[in-house]
Design a protein with these regions (language model features):
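Aromatic-capped interface at the extracytoplasmic side
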Residues: 7-13
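HKD-type phospholipase D/PLD-like phosphodiesterase module
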Residues: 14-15, 22, 27, 34-68, ...
Length: 151
């Protein structure tokens, strides 16, 4: 597990996102392309304002992923929702899906072991945005690096 400003660990290849051509070869990509062809004037974005609906949609997309999952979270706490999401992401990685996680380090106290365990999986990459260098006392880093930690 590394912060975004550090080099990737030795022995691990640098990953990149899927190209649009690769995305169109997946089941979800084909379905999205068909809908886009039917409605070229629309963006394809749909706002999920209900948190339960949004969580269910993320879980379902993760369960159907075939090639890659890129997840980015600003608020990440060690609660039931996070446990369920981590389980779903782990199951995807076990199916051979490449999972890349970008998590804001603010508010992740007590989760270093879970993130390290996930990052140890060959198909999972965990990256921390705004990482606190002094891990045991993140509050100290938050106070001494206020400008950087709040960008």
């Amino acid at each position: 597990m590394i912060g975004c400003r550090l080099e990737p660990p030795q022995g691990r290849t640098q990953s990149v996102h899927l190209s649009p051509a690769e995305t169109k070869l997946t089941t979800l990509g084909k379905a999205a392309a068909q809908e886009q062809a039917k409605h070229p004037e629309l963006s394809g974005l749909y706002l999920l304002s209900d948190p339960r609906e949004a969580f269910a949609a993320r879980g379902e997309l993760a369960k159907r992923a075939e090639k890659a999952l890129d997840v980015q979270y600003y608020i990440w706490h060690g609660d039931t929702t996070v446990s369920l999401l981590l389980e779903t992401l782990y199951e995807a990685a076990e199916r051979g899906v490449r999972v890349r996680m970008l998590i804001d380090d603010h508010g992740t106290s007590g989760l270093d072991e879970a993130f390290s365990a996930m990052d140890a999986h060959p198909n999972i990459e965990v990256r921390l945005f705004n990482p606190f260098v002094f891990r045991p006392f993140k509050l100290f880093g938050f106070v001494t690096e206020f400008d950087r930690a709040n960008r």
